[in-house]
Amino acid sequence: MKYTLQLMALGTLCLVALSANLSRAQAPQSPTTQTDRTPVLVELFTSEGCSTCPPADTLLSKLESLQPIEGAQIIALEEHVDYWNHDGWVDSYSSSDWTLRQQAYVDRFKGKSAFTPQMVVDGQSQFVGNNAREAQTAIQEASHRPKTQISITGTPADKSDIQRVEIHVGNLAGAATQEPADVWIAVTEDGLESAVKAGENAGKDLRHVATLRTLHKVGTAPAKDSSPLVLTQQVKFKSSWKKENLHIVVFVQERKSLHILGAASARVAG
């Protein structure tokens, strides 16, 4: 835990303030109305071993479920890092891969070291993950940036643990970029819970949304003058994952700046 009680209190007050705003916000948008919104990728680096992380997990859940920011379609990734696992509790959702992804952002933002909770919005802004006010501002700003168009179509395969996915990625004509950008595909799972027995959150029941299960680079985004990219992928699921809680997330990310140029999310086809 790297932050003082004063900072924790500030984060809590901000969360309460946003929660009040959320209660007055519109109901969650249907898939048809979501198309009128600009996709914004919100990543939360978190851990079940970090005492300041549960409020950030709650904030991400509210952002993802209520979609309270006008003009923004919030696409969440909850990424559990593994460097807290030495403190008495091993986070079963953690991965060294997510720790490495966070370190790339640390280098990009010229930070001194990684910390939790950390929220990163569209790869362009970062802040303490339980700060609702900063989250709202960053998401609003991101929703005004032009994005490349992405669509996802899923078709159930013969086996229950495989999903065929067709991805369409538009060219980067609308995005202000001069550098190569990669196409990534992720699987996330909602509704995960843990009864923490040790560490800073001992005795707490923690709930998670959009927990990152897998993440793979699957292609290179088409340049401004190129034809749209069409990819067909087979996405594998573990039998322990609940299919009804799974989403497939696709996003385009610049290699150097790590800016997100476009994103999309779809439920796994039954």
Name each region found by the language model.
Residues 1-11:
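Bacterial N-terminal signal peptides that target proteins for export
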Residues 12-21:
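Hydrophobic h-region of N-terminal signal peptides that target proteins for export
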Residues 14, 39, 124:
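Generic anion/oxyanion-binding catalytic loop in active/binding sites
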Residues 90-118, 124-270:
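Short, conserved sequence motifs used for protein processing/export or organelle targeting and
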Residues 21-115:
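Active-site-proximal cofactor/substrate-binding loop regions of enzyme domains
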